[in-house]
């Protein structure tokens, strides 16, 4: 979620709705196929308005498509089953929680927690069908009670030719950089904002790509009643001008439009006045990408109409985002420069929702996503109400055989990111346009800043080291709701030793120095890999500042073919799991874990 939406009161667990909804005691609805419910809801001890019922037409839709595939093959003048492809996957993550007074971990949600996903798909010639079963009857910590349930929320049938693709059912889509539309699944964050409806993709001419779609957006185990519709056009100009390709020039022009249709509702400004809410909110996006040799430049601008929502305090200010990104890359050298300004660009299919629920678009964070534990401890969450964001990244590889490069060469990476608030001239509240903001004007607050330098050096065939330094400024008040500015210096050393062709030992040592928040942190990790199947990992994250708490973990991982099994035991610190500037708060845990995945 965008953290400041729901975390201003940390004692309260994140809730994604402003008003509570009455729930069935046991709620396991699957989902509608268009206007038809599919699934089962238990009536035991349920409120009088919750009824047990089966309406399996949606499941029958996909099952029939699966069953029809072999018969379709038999009807061809080809050997039976030629061209039929079946695929699937299973992923399950389990936790047996324990109470832990020192970390605050509890087993309040049950003695056994589990998130399980099973996907099945089949394709024959130009027909593709698929479905996904999800079981979250006892969801993992950090997932709201609305996730509780099981069902088949994802199912589709797709028909594809050389120039056209037609999808009916649920689907994911992105227009451009996602400023006006991005639907996607991110299981670790509990995000699945897919659309249930139809989508058409057409490539009528070389270099011309058209998309059109309409649907209702998923919200937990339901779909909002509001409609989302849109279209996208991309033109690859070099396809029409052969001279451009001959001189290694490529130009893409794109445009998108998205509309959300939402009925009126009662939102009061005071005891006697209510808001007049727009039924349709339009958003537009235009973009251009130019490539030549090692150079790549992208410019994109999106704008949204008046859209009073719970996110922005029900103001009527137009929203927009402008982005400019340039990169250069050749052997041994890479450079990235980016800048982005966004104002009031949260976009949801349901205006009263907050957190991650019902988001139509996506605003990427111009900050580096770290993989080491301490640098990743305080990630940045994009602020949809407005921000200026900048990022610069430089990569350089010192040549082999030089004094600094050594025998195998040395890779250097320098990254700097800075996110700042926008200037706001506030002149109104709910029911007005809220504030004015000059385009180039900064606000008073720095939201986030990260300067990091990383060096990777291969000393020999068996030994490799990675060293990293990071200076971080993290505005906890802006991102989480309280806490002030946190300054930290972080040091990382990673040593990888290939002891034999099948045995590798990797160690990590990390130190975070800070006079703010919880003070200093230490982290250590030892990882032994026995190829091709086994990996043993032990780690400890220790707060040497105010809490003096150890967060230890032990993991054993076994891989064989498409199977992967991991079992473990330990503690995890409360914090934020983020991806692309979208975050979810995860409470502290202690207990045994098991994860299994399989693909076929």
Q: What are the functions of these language-model segments?
A:
Residues 59, 74-173, 179-180, 195-214, ...:
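Beta-barrel outer-membrane channel/assembly domains of diderm bacteria
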Residues 91, 106, 113, 244-248, ...:
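Exposed, low-structure sequence patches enriched in small/polar residues
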Residues 58-70:
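Bacterial N-terminal signal peptides
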Residues 140, 144-147, 220-223, 304-317:
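Outer-membrane beta-barrel proteins
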